[in-house]
Amino acid sequence: KGMGEEVIKLLLKKTNGPRILIDIKHMSPKCRKDFYAFIKIEYWNKNDRVPLICSHTGVVSKSRSLDALIQQDDDNELLDDSNYLHENSINLCAEDILIIAESNGIIGLQLDEKRIAGNNIIDIIKNNEEVDSTELRRQYVKVIFANLFEMVKTVNSVSGWDLLCIGSDYDGLVNHLDFYPTSAEMPVLRNDMLEFLQDPEEISQPGFNYSLSLIEIRRLMFGLTAETIIEKLF
């Protein structure tokens, strides 16, 4: 721990060129909790607002605090077929999001279906023979926006959109989203997301534990146009 803290201090020094900010992506919830406490004591309390970064992630909706994430059984969450979002502790909880927002940091949404969606939801969508390719793409976009809206809902302010971007992880993801397998499809994704915001609908799936009404979606846009939100994300 002592050596790790010294390395962090060296990376965040201002006297040897630009700072190298720390990416919290692969930290456990316990590590994140310790890291935030260290940053607060060593920097924030000394009027040095070091921004926090999570380069690529999804969000959980059930465990709201880091302590709850630390205590939860990740294996049970992976086996819970009612999860619409990916509720594993590798993803951010509300406490993470609020701390990152307080730091004026940034969160990138990962484009890996096994990080932004529940264990069973993608298979159900894919195996629905009544869903054509256009509707399937819209269902993928709904999963993406479920993560984004959940984070904005946590911040509960238009400033929540300034916190977010696409953090694709194309160089390391395992299960890409169909229709958007590589960076070459980013313009397609951008257009599909824009179309959803221009004509949004409830985000839900029968038998799953997450839903977002059309009224709530419109509220969480905070008066921003679809085009403005997409520009912020991309």
Provide a role label for each language-model segment:
Residues 159-163, 179-234:
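Mid-to-C-terminal alpha-helical segments outside catalytic/metal-binding sites
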Residues 1-21, 27-53, 65-78, 88-105, ...:
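Histidine/acidic residue-rich metal-binding segments in metalloenzymes
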Residues 24, 109-114, 159-181:
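Short acidic/histidine-rich active-site segments
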Residues 90-129:
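Aromatic-lined glycan-binding groove of carbohydrate-active enzymes
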